[in-house]
């Protein structure tokens, strides 16, 4: 079936002017995730912030109770004992100057990046490469740390980094279409709770303004914010 026809069919029965309770929205999304692959379930949260102002930036990391259903490749910048610790914890790529050089040459063979504090003077050179990809290690989200084992296992076990985009939206994958409705609801509520806890001091008015869920190939379904935050 052509993509256009599939999406048109998937949109049938979805009232794009209506706000659905979260559980109903998830059910609708799962019913319409009919691709041959296991589609990712995504959530978009519109916030009442302007991230161009430093005091309205929203970012953080949350451990989803049911994981993401995705296996991340984790890269760690570390030396000596910490490098060995990273390997033992299951990191896919570990290095120091050698790994910095690879990344500078465009060879980024990982999805999540962790660094020990002593490596940051070196890793700082990679800002132009890792920054636009949202992969720059940051102590605020636990990716610059001496607890290499915890960071690697967290990344492998279902932690999700979130960051508000220019339009004031946070987007994140929260599981797969094969997950049960209950597990997806739990994951979305965990993400929403973390976003609320990360509310910046400069935020004014209604913080969580709109919420929508979708699958990789399916339509978006608008959600009643109150059912996500409850």
Curated annotation (Swiss-Prot):
Coiled-coil regions listed in the entry: none
Keywords: Repressor, Ribonucleoprotein, Ribosomal protein, RNA-binding, rRNA-binding, Translation regulation, tRNA-binding
UniProt GO molecular function: rRNA binding; structural constituent of ribosome; tRNA binding
Record bears the keyword Acyltransferase: no
GO CC annotation, single: cytosolic large ribosomal subunit
One BP annotation, GO: translation
Key word Cytoplasm present: no
Family the entry assigns: Belongs to the universal ribosomal protein uL1 family.
PANTHER family given in the database record: 54S RIBOSOMAL PROTEIN L1, MITOCHONDRIAL (PTHR36427), LARGE RIBOSOMAL SUBUNIT PROTEIN UL1M (PTHR36427:SF3)
Role played: Binds directly to 23S rRNA. The L1 stalk is quite mobile in the ribosome, and is involved in E site tRNA release.
Entry protein name: Large ribosomal subunit protein uL1
């Amino acid at each position: 079936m052509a993509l256009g026809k599939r999406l048109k069919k998937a949109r049938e029965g979805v009232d794009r002017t209506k706000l659905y309770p979260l559980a109903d929205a998830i059910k609708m999304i799962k019913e319409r995730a009919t691709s041959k692959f296991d589609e990712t379930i995504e959530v978009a949260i519109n916030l009442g912030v302007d991230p161009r102002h430093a005091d309205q930036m929203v970012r953080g990391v949350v451990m989803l109770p049911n994981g993401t259903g995705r296996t991340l490749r984790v890269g760690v910048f570390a030396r000596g004992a910490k490098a060995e610790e990273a390997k033992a914890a299951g990191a896919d790529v570990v290095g120091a100057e050698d790994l910095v050089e690879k990344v500078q040459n465009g060879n980024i063979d990982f999805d999540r990046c962790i660094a020990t504090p002593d490596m940051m003077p070196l890793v700082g050179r990679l800002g132009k490469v890792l920054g636009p990809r949202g992969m720059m290690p940051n102590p605020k989200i636990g990716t610059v740390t001496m607890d290499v084992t915890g960071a690697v296992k967290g990344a492998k076990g279902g932690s999700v980094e979130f960051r508000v985009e220019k339009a004031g939206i946070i987007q994140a994958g929260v599981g797969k279409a094969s997950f049960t409705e209950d597990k997806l609801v739990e994951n979305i509520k965990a993400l929403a709770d973390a976003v609320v806890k990360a509310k910046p001091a400069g935020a004014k008015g209604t913080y969580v303004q709109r919420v929508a869920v979708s699958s990789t190939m399916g339509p978006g379904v608008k959600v009643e914010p109150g059912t996500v935050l409850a």
